[in-house]
Amino acid sequence: MEPFTIFSLVVASLVFFACWALVAPNTSKNLPPGPPKLPIIGNIHQLKSPTPHRVLKDLAKKYGPIMHLQLGQVSTVVVSTPRLAQEIMKTNDISFADRPTTTTSQIFFYKAQDIGWAPYGEYWRQMKKICTLELLSAKKVRSFSSIREEELTRIRKILEFKAGTPINYTEMTIEMVNNVICKATLGDCCKDQALLIELLYDVLKTLSAFNLASYYPRLQFLNVISGKKAKWLKMQKRLDDIMEDILKEHRAKGRAKNSDQEDLVDVLLRIKDTGGLDINVTDEHVKAVVLDMLTAGTDTSSTTLEWAMTELMRNPDMMKRAQEEVRSVVKGEHVTETDLQSLHYLKLIVKETMRLHAPTPLLVPRECRQDCNVDGYDIPAKTKVLVNAWACGVDPGSWENPDSFIPERFENSSINFMGADFQYIPFGAGRRICPGLTFGLSMVEYPLAHFLYHFDWKLPYGMKPHELDITEITTISTSLKHHLKIVPFPKSSLAK
Protein backbone atom coordinates (compact mmCIF):
# COMPACT_ATOMS: atom_id res chain seq x y z
CA MET A 1 0.00 0.00 0.00
CA GLU A 2 1.25 3.50 -0.81
CA PRO A 3 2.78 5.42 2.15
CA PHE A 4 0.43 8.36 1.59
CA THR A 5 -2.59 6.04 1.78
CA ILE A 6 -1.33 4.53 5.04
CA PHE A 7 -0.71 7.99 6.46
CA SER A 8 -4.21 9.10 5.49
CA LEU A 9 -5.75 6.07 7.18
CA VAL A 10 -3.75 6.67 10.35
CA VAL A 11 -4.78 10.34 10.51
CA ALA A 12 -8.42 9.52 9.84
CA SER A 13 -8.40 6.80 12.50
CA LEU A 14 -6.80 9.05 15.11
CA VAL A 15 -9.28 11.85 14.42
CA PHE A 16 -12.13 9.37 14.83
CA PHE A 17 -10.82 8.10 18.14
CA ALA A 18 -10.14 11.63 19.35
CA CYS A 19 -13.80 12.46 18.80
CA TRP A 20 -14.79 9.17 20.42
CA ALA A 21 -12.65 9.95 23.47
CA LEU A 22 -14.28 13.35 23.91
CA VAL A 23 -17.74 11.87 24.24
CA ALA A 24 -16.86 8.57 25.94
CA PRO A 25 -18.04 8.53 29.56
CA ASN A 26 -15.44 8.33 32.32
CA THR A 27 -16.01 4.99 34.01
CA SER A 28 -14.20 6.03 37.18
CA LYS A 29 -14.84 9.17 39.21
CA ASN A 30 -11.74 8.92 41.35
CA LEU A 31 -8.69 8.03 39.27
CA PRO A 32 -5.23 8.85 40.67
CA PRO A 33 -3.86 12.30 39.79
CA GLY A 34 -1.55 12.71 36.83
CA PRO A 35 -0.06 15.12 34.32
CA PRO A 36 -2.31 16.87 31.80
CA LYS A 37 -3.31 14.80 28.77
CA LEU A 38 -2.82 15.99 25.22
CA PRO A 39 -5.62 15.45 22.70
CA ILE A 40 -5.51 12.04 21.00
CA ILE A 41 -2.18 10.84 22.43
CA GLY A 42 -2.76 11.58 26.11
CA ASN A 43 0.62 11.12 27.83
CA ILE A 44 2.41 8.96 25.24
CA HIS A 45 4.91 11.71 24.53
CA GLN A 46 6.13 11.63 28.12
CA LEU A 47 7.37 8.05 27.75
CA LYS A 48 9.27 8.71 24.52
CA SER A 49 12.56 9.04 26.35
CA PRO A 50 15.84 7.07 26.47
CA THR A 51 15.18 6.68 30.21
CA PRO A 52 11.39 6.51 30.83
CA HIS A 53 11.90 5.30 34.42
CA ARG A 54 13.60 8.60 35.25
CA VAL A 55 10.86 10.62 33.53
CA LEU A 56 8.20 8.80 35.54
CA LYS A 57 10.10 9.32 38.79
CA ASP A 58 10.27 13.06 38.08
CA LEU A 59 6.54 13.15 37.30
CA ALA A 60 5.84 11.30 40.55
CA LYS A 61 7.57 14.08 42.49
CA LYS A 62 4.93 16.47 41.15
CA TYR A 63 1.80 14.31 40.93
CA GLY A 64 2.33 11.74 43.65
CA PRO A 65 3.53 8.15 44.15
CA ILE A 66 0.49 6.77 42.32
CA MET A 67 -0.28 8.47 39.01
CA HIS A 68 -2.72 8.03 36.18
CA LEU A 69 -1.48 8.32 32.59
CA GLN A 70 -3.59 8.04 29.47
CA LEU A 71 -1.42 6.27 26.90
CA GLY A 72 -3.59 6.63 23.82
CA GLN A 73 -6.63 4.52 24.64
CA VAL A 74 -4.84 2.58 27.37
CA SER A 75 -5.59 3.71 30.91
CA THR A 76 -2.35 3.29 32.87
CA VAL A 77 -1.41 3.62 36.52
CA VAL A 78 2.21 4.09 37.63
CA VAL A 79 3.44 3.47 41.18
CA SER A 80 6.84 4.77 42.27
CA THR A 81 7.34 4.11 46.00
CA PRO A 82 7.82 0.95 48.09
CA ARG A 83 4.52 1.49 49.91
CA LEU A 84 2.53 1.65 46.68
CA ALA A 85 4.50 -1.21 45.13
CA GLN A 86 3.46 -3.30 48.13
CA GLU A 87 -0.16 -2.29 47.56
CA ILE A 88 0.03 -3.64 44.00
CA MET A 89 2.19 -6.74 44.46
CA LYS A 90 1.15 -7.91 47.92
CA THR A 91 -2.03 -6.35 49.33
CA ASN A 92 -3.86 -6.51 45.98
CA ASP A 93 -1.58 -9.03 44.25
CA ILE A 94 -4.41 -11.28 43.06
CA SER A 95 -6.20 -8.29 41.51
CA PHE A 96 -3.08 -7.30 39.56
CA ALA A 97 -1.84 -10.76 38.59
CA ASP A 98 -2.70 -10.51 34.88
CA ARG A 99 -0.57 -9.36 31.96
CA PRO A 100 -1.81 -7.00 29.24
CA THR A 101 -2.56 -8.77 25.98
CA THR A 102 -0.27 -7.70 23.15
CA THR A 103 -0.15 -8.77 19.53
CA THR A 104 3.57 -9.50 19.75
CA SER A 105 3.36 -11.71 22.85
CA GLN A 106 0.51 -13.62 21.21
CA ILE A 107 2.58 -14.19 18.06
CA PHE A 108 6.01 -14.98 19.50
CA PHE A 109 4.95 -16.96 22.57
CA TYR A 110 2.34 -19.20 20.95
CA LYS A 111 -0.74 -17.25 22.03
CA ALA A 112 1.00 -16.23 25.28
CA GLN A 113 1.34 -19.82 26.50
CA ASP A 114 4.65 -19.10 28.21
CA ILE A 115 5.11 -18.14 31.87
CA GLY A 116 5.93 -14.46 31.48
CA TRP A 117 2.94 -13.39 29.38
CA ALA A 118 0.29 -16.03 30.12
CA PRO A 119 -2.85 -14.67 31.80
CA TYR A 120 -3.32 -15.53 35.45
CA GLY A 121 -5.21 -18.80 35.85
CA GLU A 122 -4.81 -22.55 36.21
CA TYR A 123 -2.56 -22.93 33.15
CA TRP A 124 -0.19 -20.24 34.42
CA ARG A 125 -0.14 -21.76 37.92
CA GLN A 126 0.75 -25.20 36.56
CA MET A 127 3.51 -23.87 34.30
CA LYS A 128 4.99 -21.76 37.10
CA LYS A 129 4.98 -24.87 39.28
CA ILE A 130 7.07 -26.66 36.64
CA CYS A 131 9.41 -23.71 36.50
CA THR A 132 9.84 -23.42 40.27
CA LEU A 133 10.18 -27.12 41.10
CA GLU A 134 11.92 -28.45 38.00
CA LEU A 135 13.33 -25.96 35.51
CA LEU A 136 14.89 -23.31 37.75
CA SER A 137 15.15 -24.89 41.19
CA ALA A 138 18.35 -24.29 43.16
CA LYS A 139 19.37 -27.91 42.54
CA LYS A 140 18.86 -27.57 38.79
CA VAL A 141 20.79 -24.30 38.64
CA ARG A 142 23.70 -25.99 40.48
CA SER A 143 23.68 -28.79 37.92
CA PHE A 144 24.66 -26.24 35.25
CA SER A 145 27.86 -25.25 37.09
CA SER A 146 30.08 -27.18 34.66
CA ILE A 147 28.57 -25.21 31.76
CA ARG A 148 29.39 -21.91 33.47
CA GLU A 149 32.91 -23.11 34.31
CA GLU A 150 33.58 -24.30 30.76
CA GLU A 151 32.44 -21.00 29.24
CA LEU A 152 34.48 -18.90 31.66
CA THR A 153 37.57 -20.99 30.96
CA ARG A 154 37.10 -20.17 27.28
CA ILE A 155 36.70 -16.46 28.09
CA ARG A 156 39.79 -16.52 30.29
CA LYS A 157 41.95 -17.83 27.44
CA ILE A 158 40.69 -15.09 25.14
CA LEU A 159 41.42 -12.40 27.73
CA GLU A 160 44.91 -13.76 28.34
CA PHE A 161 45.57 -13.63 24.61
CA LYS A 162 44.33 -10.01 24.47
CA ALA A 163 46.11 -8.94 27.64
CA GLY A 164 47.14 -5.30 27.66
CA THR A 165 44.76 -4.26 24.89
CA PRO A 166 41.24 -2.80 25.23
CA ILE A 167 38.43 -5.34 25.00
CA ASN A 168 34.70 -4.75 24.63
CA TYR A 169 33.57 -6.01 28.01
CA THR A 170 29.90 -5.45 27.15
CA GLU A 171 29.99 -7.64 24.04
CA MET A 172 32.06 -10.28 25.84
CA THR A 173 29.54 -10.68 28.66
CA ILE A 174 26.58 -10.75 26.27
CA GLU A 175 28.21 -13.58 24.32
CA MET A 176 29.10 -15.45 27.50
CA VAL A 177 25.59 -15.24 28.95
CA ASN A 178 24.01 -16.29 25.65
CA ASN A 179 26.28 -19.33 25.38
CA VAL A 180 25.53 -20.51 28.91
CA ILE A 181 21.77 -20.00 28.60
CA CYS A 182 21.63 -21.81 25.26
CA LYS A 183 23.68 -24.76 26.56
CA ALA A 184 21.66 -25.03 29.77
CA THR A 185 18.35 -24.80 27.91
CA LEU A 186 19.07 -26.71 24.71
CA GLY A 187 22.15 -28.81 25.42
CA ASP A 188 24.08 -29.53 22.24
CA CYS A 189 20.92 -29.81 20.15
CA CYS A 190 21.02 -26.51 18.30
CA LYS A 191 23.10 -26.38 15.16
CA ASP A 192 21.60 -22.94 14.38
CA GLN A 193 22.59 -21.21 17.65
CA ALA A 194 23.92 -18.06 15.98
CA LEU A 195 20.71 -17.62 13.98
CA LEU A 196 18.61 -18.44 17.05
CA ILE A 197 20.34 -15.76 19.15
CA GLU A 198 19.92 -13.22 16.35
CA LEU A 199 16.20 -13.99 16.16
CA LEU A 200 15.83 -13.84 19.95
CA TYR A 201 17.28 -10.34 20.01
CA ASP A 202 14.95 -9.34 17.19
CA VAL A 203 12.03 -10.62 19.27
CA LEU A 204 13.18 -8.74 22.37
CA LYS A 205 13.63 -5.54 20.39
CA THR A 206 10.16 -5.97 18.89
CA LEU A 207 8.59 -6.53 22.31
CA SER A 208 10.19 -3.34 23.67
CA ALA A 209 9.73 -1.18 20.57
CA PHE A 210 7.11 1.55 20.21
CA ASN A 211 4.01 0.20 18.48
CA LEU A 212 1.12 2.61 17.87
CA ALA A 213 -1.47 -0.16 17.86
CA SER A 214 -0.46 -1.15 21.41
CA TYR A 215 -1.80 2.21 22.59
CA TYR A 216 -4.86 2.12 20.34
CA PRO A 217 -6.17 -1.48 20.49
CA ARG A 218 -8.87 -0.68 17.92
CA LEU A 219 -6.19 0.20 15.39
CA GLN A 220 -4.69 -3.29 15.15
CA PHE A 221 -5.29 -3.17 11.40
CA LEU A 222 -2.36 -0.75 11.22
CA ASN A 223 -0.02 -3.64 11.99
CA VAL A 224 -1.46 -5.42 8.97
CA ILE A 225 -1.40 -2.60 6.41
CA SER A 226 2.05 -1.42 7.52
CA GLY A 227 3.49 -4.89 7.01
CA LYS A 228 4.55 -5.22 10.66
CA LYS A 229 2.38 -8.24 11.38
CA ALA A 230 3.64 -10.06 8.29
CA LYS A 231 7.22 -9.36 9.41
CA TRP A 232 6.49 -10.66 12.92
CA LEU A 233 4.83 -13.80 11.59
CA LYS A 234 7.84 -14.45 9.36
CA MET A 235 10.17 -14.08 12.36
CA GLN A 236 7.99 -16.43 14.38
CA LYS A 237 7.99 -19.01 11.59
CA ARG A 238 11.80 -18.98 11.48
CA LEU A 239 11.91 -19.36 15.26
CA ASP A 240 9.36 -22.15 15.22
CA ASP A 241 11.34 -24.07 12.59
CA ILE A 242 14.39 -23.96 14.85
CA MET A 243 12.31 -24.94 17.90
CA GLU A 244 10.82 -27.86 15.99
CA ASP A 245 14.29 -29.11 15.02
CA ILE A 246 15.43 -28.83 18.64
CA LEU A 247 12.51 -30.95 19.87
CA LYS A 248 13.16 -33.56 17.16
CA GLU A 249 16.85 -33.79 18.06
CA HIS A 250 16.05 -34.18 21.75
CA ARG A 251 13.56 -36.94 21.06
CA ALA A 252 16.03 -38.69 18.75
CA LYS A 253 18.82 -38.78 21.36
CA GLY A 254 16.51 -40.21 24.04
CA ARG A 255 16.25 -39.34 27.71
CA ALA A 256 19.21 -38.44 29.89
CA LYS A 257 20.38 -41.14 32.33
CA ASN A 258 19.78 -38.91 35.35
CA SER A 259 18.20 -35.56 36.08
CA ASP A 260 21.56 -33.80 36.52
CA GLN A 261 22.31 -34.49 32.85
CA GLU A 262 19.02 -33.04 31.62
CA ASP A 263 18.88 -29.68 29.88
CA LEU A 264 15.68 -27.67 30.22
CA VAL A 265 14.16 -29.05 27.01
CA ASP A 266 14.76 -32.59 28.35
CA VAL A 267 12.91 -31.66 31.54
CA LEU A 268 9.92 -30.23 29.67
CA LEU A 269 9.66 -33.21 27.32
CA ARG A 270 9.87 -35.63 30.26
CA ILE A 271 7.04 -33.79 32.02
CA LYS A 272 5.01 -33.73 28.81
CA ASP A 273 5.44 -37.47 28.27
CA THR A 274 4.92 -38.63 31.87
CA GLY A 275 2.06 -36.30 32.76
CA GLY A 276 1.41 -35.59 36.41
CA LEU A 277 -0.06 -32.14 35.83
CA ASP A 278 -3.65 -30.95 35.78
CA ILE A 279 -3.16 -29.72 32.21
CA ASN A 280 -2.27 -31.47 28.98
CA VAL A 281 1.18 -30.15 28.00
CA THR A 282 1.65 -29.81 24.23
CA ASP A 283 4.66 -29.13 22.03
CA GLU A 284 3.51 -25.52 21.71
CA HIS A 285 3.59 -25.14 25.49
CA VAL A 286 7.11 -26.59 25.56
CA LYS A 287 8.31 -24.23 22.83
CA ALA A 288 6.72 -21.19 24.49
CA VAL A 289 8.41 -21.92 27.83
CA VAL A 290 11.75 -22.63 26.12
CA LEU A 291 11.56 -19.21 24.46
CA ASP A 292 10.86 -17.72 27.89
CA MET A 293 14.00 -19.33 29.26
CA LEU A 294 16.08 -18.11 26.31
CA THR A 295 14.83 -14.52 26.33
CA ALA A 296 14.29 -13.76 30.03
CA GLY A 297 17.94 -13.71 31.08
CA THR A 298 19.62 -12.93 27.78
CA ASP A 299 20.01 -9.22 28.40
CA THR A 300 19.45 -8.69 32.11
CA SER A 301 22.41 -10.76 33.40
CA SER A 302 24.90 -9.23 30.97
CA THR A 303 23.59 -5.74 31.77
CA THR A 304 24.12 -6.32 35.50
CA LEU A 305 27.67 -7.56 34.84
CA GLU A 306 28.29 -4.45 32.75
CA TRP A 307 27.08 -2.07 35.47
CA ALA A 308 28.92 -3.92 38.26
CA MET A 309 32.25 -3.67 36.44
CA THR A 310 31.52 -0.05 35.50
CA GLU A 311 31.01 0.90 39.14
CA LEU A 312 34.18 -0.94 40.17
CA MET A 313 36.18 0.88 37.50
CA ARG A 314 34.77 4.17 38.81
CA ASN A 315 35.60 3.22 42.40
CA PRO A 316 39.16 1.82 42.56
CA ASP A 317 39.05 1.32 46.34
CA MET A 318 36.01 -0.94 45.94
CA MET A 319 37.76 -2.82 43.12
CA LYS A 320 40.80 -3.36 45.34
CA ARG A 321 38.71 -4.61 48.26
CA ALA A 322 36.69 -6.97 46.05
CA GLN A 323 39.83 -8.44 44.43
CA GLU A 324 41.56 -8.87 47.77
CA GLU A 325 38.54 -10.75 49.07
CA VAL A 326 38.32 -13.08 46.07
CA ARG A 327 42.06 -13.77 46.04
CA SER A 328 42.14 -14.51 49.77
CA VAL A 329 39.16 -16.88 49.63
CA VAL A 330 40.05 -18.88 46.50
CA LYS A 331 42.71 -21.48 47.32
CA GLY A 332 43.18 -23.25 43.99
CA GLU A 333 43.84 -22.14 40.42
CA HIS A 334 40.17 -21.52 39.69
CA VAL A 335 37.18 -19.94 41.36
CA THR A 336 34.57 -22.53 42.27
CA GLU A 337 30.92 -21.87 42.88
CA THR A 338 31.44 -23.12 46.43
CA ASP A 339 33.81 -20.18 46.94
CA LEU A 340 30.90 -17.78 46.34
CA GLN A 341 29.47 -18.55 49.77
CA SER A 342 32.48 -16.79 51.33
CA LEU A 343 32.56 -13.80 48.98
CA HIS A 344 30.61 -11.46 51.22
CA TYR A 345 31.72 -8.15 49.72
CA LEU A 346 31.22 -9.34 46.14
CA LYS A 347 27.61 -10.19 46.99
CA LEU A 348 27.16 -6.69 48.41
CA ILE A 349 28.44 -5.25 45.13
CA VAL A 350 25.93 -7.29 43.13
CA LYS A 351 23.08 -6.23 45.43
CA GLU A 352 24.01 -2.57 45.19
CA THR A 353 24.39 -2.80 41.41
CA MET A 354 20.85 -4.13 41.06
CA ARG A 355 19.51 -1.43 43.37
CA LEU A 356 21.08 1.54 41.59
CA HIS A 357 21.04 0.03 38.09
CA ALA A 358 17.97 -2.20 37.97
CA PRO A 359 18.27 -4.03 34.61
CA THR A 360 14.49 -3.80 34.15
CA PRO A 361 13.66 -0.52 35.93
CA LEU A 362 9.99 -0.69 34.93
CA LEU A 363 8.78 -4.17 35.77
CA VAL A 364 6.87 -6.13 33.14
CA PRO A 365 3.40 -4.50 33.06
CA ARG A 366 0.55 -5.94 35.05
CA GLU A 367 -3.16 -5.59 34.33
CA CYS A 368 -5.99 -5.12 36.79
CA ARG A 369 -8.32 -8.16 36.70
CA GLN A 370 -11.23 -6.45 38.46
CA ASP A 371 -12.28 -3.05 39.75
CA CYS A 372 -10.39 -2.30 42.94
CA ASN A 373 -9.22 0.52 45.17
CA VAL A 374 -5.58 1.42 45.83
CA ASP A 375 -4.59 4.15 48.27
CA GLY A 376 -8.11 5.59 48.09
CA TYR A 377 -8.22 5.72 44.27
CA ASP A 378 -10.43 3.72 41.92
CA ILE A 379 -8.56 1.40 39.55
CA PRO A 380 -10.93 0.03 36.89
CA ALA A 381 -10.57 -3.47 35.48
CA LYS A 382 -8.22 -3.73 32.46
CA THR A 383 -6.09 -0.82 33.68
CA LYS A 384 -2.42 -1.31 32.82
CA VAL A 385 -0.11 -0.99 35.84
CA LEU A 386 3.58 -0.07 35.78
CA VAL A 387 5.74 -0.53 38.87
CA ASN A 388 8.84 1.67 38.80
CA ALA A 389 11.22 -0.73 40.56
CA TRP A 390 14.16 1.60 40.00
CA ALA A 391 12.33 4.50 41.70
CA CYS A 392 11.65 2.22 44.69
CA GLY A 393 15.36 1.38 44.77
CA VAL A 394 16.36 5.03 45.01
CA ASP A 395 13.49 6.17 47.22
CA PRO A 396 14.93 8.77 49.65
CA GLY A 397 12.49 7.65 52.32
CA SER A 398 13.98 4.16 52.26
CA TRP A 399 17.65 4.70 51.48
CA GLU A 400 20.36 7.03 52.75
CA ASN A 401 22.29 8.69 49.89
CA PRO A 402 20.14 6.76 47.39
CA ASP A 403 21.94 8.03 44.28
CA SER A 404 25.39 6.90 45.45
CA PHE A 405 26.96 3.47 44.88
CA ILE A 406 27.58 2.16 48.40
CA PRO A 407 27.72 -1.67 48.64
CA GLU A 408 28.30 -1.41 52.40
CA ARG A 409 24.68 -0.27 52.86
CA PHE A 410 23.67 -3.95 52.65
CA GLU A 411 26.14 -5.03 55.36
CA ASN A 412 24.24 -6.54 58.29
CA SER A 413 21.00 -5.91 56.37
CA SER A 414 18.26 -8.50 55.95
CA ILE A 415 17.07 -6.94 52.67
CA ASN A 416 17.24 -9.47 49.85
CA PHE A 417 16.07 -10.25 46.31
CA MET A 418 13.09 -12.40 47.29
CA GLY A 419 10.37 -9.76 46.92
CA ALA A 420 9.49 -9.21 50.58
CA ASP A 421 11.31 -5.87 50.76
CA PHE A 422 9.51 -3.48 48.45
CA GLN A 423 12.25 -0.87 48.49
CA TYR A 424 14.34 -3.49 46.67
CA ILE A 425 12.52 -5.41 43.92
CA PRO A 426 14.87 -5.94 40.93
CA PHE A 427 13.17 -9.30 40.26
CA GLY A 428 9.65 -8.10 41.06
CA ALA A 429 7.48 -9.50 43.85
CA GLY A 430 4.30 -11.44 44.50
CA ARG A 431 2.88 -14.11 42.24
CA ARG A 432 4.63 -12.64 39.21
CA ILE A 433 8.11 -12.48 40.72
CA CYS A 434 10.76 -13.60 38.25
CA PRO A 435 11.10 -17.40 38.64
CA GLY A 436 14.63 -17.25 37.17
CA LEU A 437 16.06 -15.33 40.13
CA THR A 438 18.51 -18.07 41.22
CA PHE A 439 19.69 -18.72 37.67
CA GLY A 440 20.13 -15.00 37.05
CA LEU A 441 22.28 -14.50 40.16
CA SER A 442 24.47 -17.45 39.17
CA MET A 443 25.15 -15.69 35.86
CA VAL A 444 26.36 -12.56 37.66
CA GLU A 445 28.15 -13.55 40.88
CA TYR A 446 30.29 -16.38 39.51
CA PRO A 447 31.52 -14.61 36.33
CA LEU A 448 32.27 -11.42 38.29
CA ALA A 449 34.32 -13.38 40.84
CA HIS A 450 36.15 -15.07 37.96
CA PHE A 451 37.02 -11.75 36.29
CA LEU A 452 38.25 -10.21 39.56
CA TYR A 453 40.32 -13.24 40.54
CA HIS A 454 42.21 -13.83 37.30
CA PHE A 455 42.64 -10.27 36.04
CA ASP A 456 43.45 -6.72 36.99
CA TRP A 457 41.54 -4.13 34.98
CA LYS A 458 42.40 -0.65 33.77
CA LEU A 459 40.63 2.00 31.74
CA PRO A 460 42.10 2.53 28.25
CA TYR A 461 44.03 5.50 26.86
CA GLY A 462 44.85 7.01 30.25
CA MET A 463 41.20 7.62 31.11
CA LYS A 464 40.49 8.56 34.73
CA PRO A 465 37.71 6.82 36.73
CA HIS A 466 35.55 9.96 36.88
CA GLU A 467 35.77 10.32 33.07
CA LEU A 468 33.96 7.04 32.42
CA ASP A 469 30.71 7.76 30.55
CA ILE A 470 27.75 6.29 32.44
CA THR A 471 24.98 7.66 30.22
CA GLU A 472 22.00 5.27 30.27
CA ILE A 473 19.81 4.08 27.45
CA THR A 474 16.74 1.87 27.70
CA THR A 475 16.19 -0.65 24.91
CA ILE A 476 15.63 -4.25 25.99
CA SER A 477 17.02 -3.33 29.41
CA THR A 478 18.66 -0.20 30.80
CA SER A 479 22.35 -0.38 29.96
CA LEU A 480 25.26 1.90 29.16
CA LYS A 481 24.67 3.96 26.04
CA HIS A 482 28.28 3.28 25.02
CA HIS A 483 29.79 -0.17 25.53
CA LEU A 484 32.27 -0.58 28.36
CA LYS A 485 35.80 -0.99 27.00
CA ILE A 486 38.53 -1.89 29.48
CA VAL A 487 41.99 -3.47 29.51
CA PRO A 488 42.67 -6.88 31.16
CA PHE A 489 46.01 -7.76 32.75
CA PRO A 490 46.41 -11.36 33.99
CA LYS A 491 47.86 -11.64 37.48
CA SER A 492 51.47 -12.71 36.97
CA SER A 493 51.21 -15.27 39.72
CA LEU A 494 48.15 -16.85 38.11
CA ALA A 495 48.88 -16.53 34.39
CA LYS A 496 49.90 -19.69 32.61
Swiss-Prot record:
Catalytic activity: germacra-1(10),4,11(13)-trien-12-oate + reduced [NADPH--hemoprotein reductase] + O2 = (+)-costunolide + oxidized [NADPH--hemoprotein reductase] + 2 H2O
Binding site for heme: 434
Main location: membrane
InterPro entries named in the record: Cyt_P450, Cyt_P450_CS, Cyt_P450_E_grp-I, Cyt_P450_sf
PROSITE patterns (alphabetical): CYTOCHROME_P450
Transmembrane stretches, start-end: 4-24
Class of enzymatic activity (EC top level): oxidoreductase
Glycosylated sites: 26, 168, 280, 412
Membrane-topology annotation of the record: Single-pass type II membrane protein
Top-level taxon of origin: Eukaryota
Necessary cofactors: heme
UniProt entry keywords in alphabetical sequence: Glycoprotein, Heme, Iron, Membrane, Metal-binding, Monooxygenase, Oxidoreductase, Signal-anchor, Transmembrane, Transmembrane helix
Keyword Metal-binding among UniProt keywords: yes
Gene Ontology terms, MF aspect: costunolide synthase activity; heme binding; iron ion binding
GO cellular component entries: membrane
Tissue-by-tissue expression: Expressed in floral glandular trichomes.
Cellular localization per UniProt: Membrane
A Pfam family recorded for this sequence: p450
CDD domains (UniProt xref): CYP71-like
The EC number(s) this enzyme carries: 1.14.14.150
Keyword Heme in annotation: yes
Function: Involved in the biosynthesis of germacrene-derived sesquiterpene lactones. Component of the parthenolide biosynthetic pathway; parthenolide and conjugates are promising anti-cancer drugs highly active against colon cancer cells. Hydroxylates germacrene A acid to 6-alpha-hydroxy-germacrene A acid, a precursor of sesquiterpene lactones that spontaneously undergoes a lactonization which yields costunolide.
Family that this chain belongs to: Belongs to the cytochrome P450 family.
PANTHER family: CYTOCHROME P450 (PTHR47955:SF13), CYTOCHROME P450 FAMILY 71 PROTEIN (PTHR47955)
Name of the protein described by the UniProt record: Costunolide synthase
Organism this protein belongs to: Tanacetum parthenium (Feverfew)
Source taxonomy: Eukaryota, Viridiplantae, Streptophyta, Embryophyta, Tracheophyta
Name of the encoding gene: CYP71BL2
